[in-house]
Amino acid sequence: AVSPAAATAFLGAQLGAGLAVLLQLNDFSKLLGASSLALVATYPLMKRITNWPQAFLGLTFNWGALLGYAAVHGTLDPYVTLPLYLSAASWTLLYDTIYAHQDKDDDARVGVKSTALHFGDDTKKYLAGFGALSTAGLLTSGAAAGLGAPFYLGVSAAAAHLAWQVRDVDLDDRDDCARKFKSNGTYGGLVFAAIVAGKLAGAG
């Protein structure tokens, strides 16, 4: 087990490293980065408050979609960044709901909330919806950014991967939920490759 002192020291190191990076950015990005602290500070409470803690995680964890753009451009283009942010948040909802199904019995016993418990037997319907929202957000953002044809091919492959996850996952099998959760590294790699290839093609 991790002691409170060790956890506090680790947190301090992480905050210090984050601050060091943030101070290298433009003023707009500094403000945007600092504004995420409200989400970071309140997220740990969400499992006690709402049936949708995974949604709050999505908003918190993917703030970098906004911050990365701002760090490069010094501003935000809402037509590019908002669909990307919502796409990433929807993806987080999908994979963290799958992850939460590993712990649903324990969560129910101790009285904490999750989308896995909230959706129950309808989980796969919700997962399909989150996958569709994530894909739509990526396509909208890519079109606004002027990405080339390889982007759309890559997103199609990524969408097929999400569809496989949703169709194939056994939500009552902890090991399978863990496998599907870990497979999101493949999904992320496909999206990254799609963006890079689309940017290179669009630049031409």
Cite the ranges covered by each PLM segment.
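Solvent-exposed interhelical
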Residues: 1-19, 88-140, 169-181, 185-188
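Intramembrane alpha-helical segments
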Residues: 1-83, 140, 163-170
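A short hydrophobic/aromatic micro-motif that marks alpha-helical segments and, especially, helix-coil
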Residues: 18-20, 41, 65-68, 75, ...
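Alpha-helical transmembrane segments
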Residues: 28-35, 56, 79-91, 126-129, 136, 147-154, ...
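Alpha-helical transmembrane segments of multi-pass membrane proteins
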Residues: 40-44, 87-92, 99, 157-164
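Extended hydrophobic alpha-helices typical of membrane-associated regions
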Residues: 140-204
